[in-house]
Curated annotation (Swiss-Prot):
Its EC number is 6.3.5.-. The keyword Nucleotide-binding applies. InterPro entries: Asp/Glu-ADT_sf_sub_c, GatC. Keywords: ATP-binding, Ligase, Nucleotide-binding, Protein biosynthesis. It is an enzyme of class 6 (ligase). Allows the formation of correctly charged Asn-tRNA(Asn) or Gln-tRNA(Gln) through the transamidation of misacylated Asp-tRNA(Asn) or Glu-tRNA(Gln) in organisms which lack either or both of asparaginyl-tRNA or glutaminyl-tRNA synthetases. The reaction takes place in the presence of glutamine and ATP through an activated phospho-Asp-tRNA(Asn) or phospho-Glu-tRNA(Gln). Coiled coil: none annotated. It comes from the Bacteria. It catalyses: L-glutamyl-tRNA(Gln) + L-glutamine + ATP + H2O = L-glutaminyl-tRNA(Gln) + L-glutamate + ADP + phosphate + H(+); L-aspartyl-tRNA(Asn) + L-glutamine + ATP + H2O = L-asparaginyl-tRNA(Asn) + L-glutamate + ADP + phosphate + 2 H(+). This is Aspartyl/glutamyl-tRNA(Asn/Gln) amidotransferase subunit C. Heterotrimer of A, B and C subunits.
Length: 95
């Protein structure tokens, strides 16, 4: 996979990063190098290797699934600037 100049500009726009035309070739090379490294990783034989979620073995602490105080939705949303039907209202952030 190779990244072209138009893709670099699109990524910069999506990330809201100002990129000049002079910077595009350098970033294109950097992104292509990263993708080449990821392609190398796909060649590694991982058959029989257990997936890891941490470098040290860990177990999640579990709690009893019991009913606690409920019906406090009004208390939860009372400090929110905008709510509707006990849901938080937030400004639209996706174009």
């Amino acid at each position: 996979m190779s990244v072209d100049a138009a893709t670099v500009r699109k990524i910069a726009q999506l990330a809201r990063i100002a990129v000049t035309d002079a910077e595009v070739p350098h970033l294109q090379g950097e992104l292509n190098a990263m993708l080449a490294f990821v392609e190398q990783l796909s060649e590694v034989n991982v058959e029989g290797v257990e997936p890891m979620t941490s470098v040290t073995p860990m177990a999640m602490k579990k709690r009893q699934d019991v009913v606690t105080e409920g019906d406090i939705a009004d208390d939860i949303v009372k400090n929110a600037p905008m709510t509707e039907n006990n849901f938080f209202l937030v400004p639209k952030v996706v174009e």
